[in-house]
Regions:
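Catalytic cores of PAPS-dependent sulfotransferases
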Residues: 47, 52-73, 108-126, 131-140, ...
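Alpha-helical structural motif
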Residues: 4, 113-116, 155, 159
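Phosphate-binding site of ATP-dependent enzymes
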Residues: 2-94
Length: 189
């Protein structure tokens, strides 16, 4: 117990996001949450299947599927159109290419997963909604606003442009610089 407590306290002191330029995490107070252990899916290796829905303002666009994740060298991935479950693995490149060796059947709870992804992603220009399926029911994993810290190289340029075209950003708000000395640096002339 003492060793676990030490490890958790050490983890809580780390500034999550510092090394990956994910500054949006800095304002969040770190917490440890203990959850019930979800059973693994023996038909697909040593872990649950992780369904990662890339969503754009409430619209699930595609789903990256990951399983067998206990060892990085054994990870398997797949890429599917979120609505039709058509395999779109031809868009996979780079680090995922060698891992793209699976054909995962359509999850029994896909319609409920899509409904959950729609509701959870509504109002966000882009967010990844991660879900699992346990006993035919969707289970929430997490919301991810910067997949792979914004440095994911696992998709082709064409697919990145297709996903990027799904984003509709609100008009930028003009604000005064937060540092008064910065105003002089921004003036021209």
């Amino acid at each position: 117990i003492r060793s676990i407590r030490r490890t958790l306290n050490h983890t809580l002191r780390k500034k999550f996001g510092r090394m990956t330029a994910e500054h949006h995490y800095f304002g969040i107070k770190p917490r440890i949450i203990a959850e019930r252990l979800l059973p693994s899916e023996p038909a697909f290796g040593n872990s649950l299947i992780d369904y990662k829905f890339y969503c754009f303002d409430g619209n699930p666009y595609c789903c990256m599927v990951c399983y067998n994740r206990k060892s990085p060298s054994d990870v398997k991935t797949g890429l599917y159109d979120a609505r039709t479950w058509k395999n779109i693995g031809h868009y996979v490149t780079g680090k995922y290419y060698d891992q793209h060796q699976c054909d995962i059947p359509r999850p029994a709870s896909l319609d409920r997963m899509l409904d959950a992804a729609k509701r959870l992603s509504s109002g966000f220009p882009q967010v990844r909604v991660d879900l699992y399926e346990v006993a035919g029911n969707p289970v929430f994993g997490e919301l991810t606003f910067t997949s792979s810290a914004g440095m994911d190289t696992g998709f082709s340029q064409e697919f990145q442009e297709l996903m990027g075209s799904q984003i509709s950003l609100p008009p930028a708000k003009r604000t005064q610089p937060s540092h008064p000395g910065l105003l002089g640096l921004l003036e021209i002339g």
